[in-house]
């Protein structure tokens, strides 16, 4: 099931209560802690979704800087992006010195690095140290659990960070998510198709991971046996045709009589 931009944004707005608490924790730590933050969890759990939800949180004291991790990324490029934001603010307030610009305005730059698993371990360590020495900078890495374990094994950086792990959906939340998808996307799954048996089947197959649930709906869309609405519609059409033929036949019999 391919999702368009609007559908992706709609899915990004599905934030269950336990994930709302993670978002609140994220906001609290950005405000009150200098520690680097790591959003972690398995592929498809919704790490980038939480990052999107954070960016939807408007705070006049924050400037977001989103960087997508890739193998070409280096410290100079990140520092250049950081300085670009400072000079953008400087152009709006030329009376302030560059060195004290964000301190005087009480602004923080929140550096968001999605897909940080592509970064070299030494680069992650360097970014953490850079953030510690820059009081206006907060940094958030997005990593899978495996990437956290692998990179921590090589550079031991986890003790310098605060981990925020995204939980899997519970079975009731899986049901809510399916209902949400049926209303917000172009999936053939209708709200009325969702029942206990379907929820149980999808939950067991996906482990409550939203990305896997979305992928599972592609099977649903491509397999008519799952689509009770389509079957009901076909049966209804066949029934109407049969009724019309019977009525026509009875009329012909009566006419000949």
Model-predicted segments: where are they?
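Conserved P-loop NTPase "ATPase switch" module shared by AAA+ and STAND
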Residues: 100-123, 127
